[in-house]
Amino acid sequence: MCIVAQNNYQQAEEYFMQENFSKAKPIFDSYLKQHPGDKKTREYLGDIAAYGKNWDTAISYYKALVQDEETNANYHFKYGGAMGLKAMSISRIRAFTYIGDIKYELERAAKLDTKHIEARWALVEFYIQLPGIFGGSENKANDYANELGKISKVDGYLANGYIAEYTDRPKDAERYYKKAIEVGGSPHTYEKLSSLYEKNNQPKEAIATTSESLKKHKRNQLNYQIGKISAQYNLEPEYGIECLSQYLADYSIKDGVRKDWAYYRLAQIYKNLGKKEIALTWINKALLDQTDFKEAQKEKSLILAL
């Protein structure tokens, strides 16, 4: 029986790693009934609840874990993080009652683990987003961003870029994100810079940045991103069509953006080019599998009006 139970548990962990939580949860629930004090299982169940945005359930698991092991930084981080995410989902008046506990748990996590990156990132976001009257502080956000920089230069640059972007200093944000690319060069660093350019109405720079990332990382999702920018800003249509065609040719569910969105972007580009019939072909394809695709319905009306 022990071997069978162990095999079942390992299977649940595999499901968890695959994010197949509907299969993992019943096995963990069953195991917890037999081993009610097992911290690892309770953490798994808390994580599954958090993934499903069942904040009260997640908070309940993490709070109990913190009480059982007060010196575990990760438990404090998850407890504080779950409360923070719940606070974002409720009214402001109710959310303010969580501020003290969120701050305590995240700062406790950072103090217990001097290299806990996620806790420091959460504190950067906490202090920069919270109004000053309730304890928000750009200086404290900067302090935690600088702590991140000592642990990971890339995270430090990204955090400082995030603060600059949030406080409407796009030139400073651009400088920090470029440094993050220079030091790290991960897809995420390119994505942050490209997103900044999009927000500040710099589509040429956004396409150039995403194109550079595509050449380096060969991620198919970047083909879609280039096509999206091309469609939205009526920019480099041939390149946009090429990238969207490549996206569809290499598509897998892991790419994250459904095919009908690529069809929609192709329709937009052809509409921008004044090619009504081709645009209609693509927009009808977008609506074929998803008839309630509101953006595509609106786009079709614009195409028909050409």
Q: What is each model feature region?
A:
Residues P36, E70, T114, I151-K153, ...:
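Short coil turns that delineate tetratricopeptide repeat
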Residues Y15, A49, M83, I90, ...:
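Residue at a conserved register position within TPR or TPR-like alpha-solenoid repeats
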Residues T41, Y75, A119, G156-L158, ...:
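TPR alpha-solenoid repeat register
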Residues Y15, K53-Q67, T71-K115, W121-E147, ...:
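Short coil/linker segments at helix-helix boundaries
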Residues K40, Y44-L45, K78-G81, A122, ...:
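Canonical tetratricopeptide repeat
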Residues E13, E125, E191, S195-K199, ...:
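Alpha-helical adaptor scaffolds
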